[in-house]
Design a protein with these regions (language model features):
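Short, charged low-complexity linear segments at domain edges
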Residues: 1-22
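N-terminal interaction modules that seed assembly of large macromolecular complexes
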Residues: 16-59
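A general secondary-structure signal for short beta-strands and their flanking turns/coil
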Residues: 29, 81-85, 140-142
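Short secondary-structure junctions and interdomain/linker hinges
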Residues: 58-65, 95
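Short Fe-S-cluster ligation motifs
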Residues: 62-78
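Short flanking/linker segments adjacent to small metal-binding domains or redox-active Cys/His motifs
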Residues: 73-126
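Glycine-rich, aromatic-bearing surface loops/beta-hairpins
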Residues: 117-163
């Protein structure tokens, strides 16, 4: 299925992507029980419907992301900013990210076309992928995700975390 964004397009085999996630036993934070991973899992249901629909339309289960890390926080809003990596079975059609920047993953954010799902979630796609499960079907397209997630584990996260 062709997805057109502001200045680039991707072609995603949504059903193969969805099938992979449905059959995978991997979970986000597999083997990790830290409070930040617990918060992401617990906060998923409170994410904006538009964000959940975006991932679902691509066939991606964000709770099975290859990586999801809290990078910084906004104490006034009780929000954590997570960066993550998800994989899709697909390819770039035009507006290739790689034409715009040859820098490593997160450094590329400032130099590449991005798509804002909404004010709380931005993504970009690349064929320069990492952390792909061996069983993931080709062709692999990596989606880098930056997402605001509320602290939902009670109280303020500043009472729990030391940044």
């Amino acid at each position: 299925m062709l997805f057109r964004f502001d200045n680039f397009s991707i072609d995603v085999d949504v059903e193969r992507t969805r099938k992979y996630y449905a059959e995978s036993s991997r979970t986000l934070t597999e083997g990790c029980d830290c409070i930040l991973c617990q918060n992401f899992r617990a906060a998923y249901e409170s994410l904006d419907t538009e964000i959940k629909r975006f991932f679902d339309n691509l066939g991606v289960d964000i709770l099975q992301a290859a990586d999801m890390t809290a990078m910084h926080a906004d104490a006034k809003r009780n929000i954590l900013y997570y960066d993550g990596v998800c994989h899709l079975c697909g390819s770039m059609v035009d507006g290739s990210i790689e034409k715009h920047c040859d820098q490593p993953l997160r450094k590329a954010w400032h130099h590449t076309p991005q798509y804002a799902v909404n004010a709380a979630c931005t993504v970009y796609f690349t064929t320069n992928y990492a952390m792909v499960e061996k069983s993931f079907p080709d062709p692999v397209l990596q989606m880098e995700v930056a997402i605001e997630v509320p602290w939902v584990l009670g109280g303020k996260f500043t009472d729990t975390l030391q940044w």
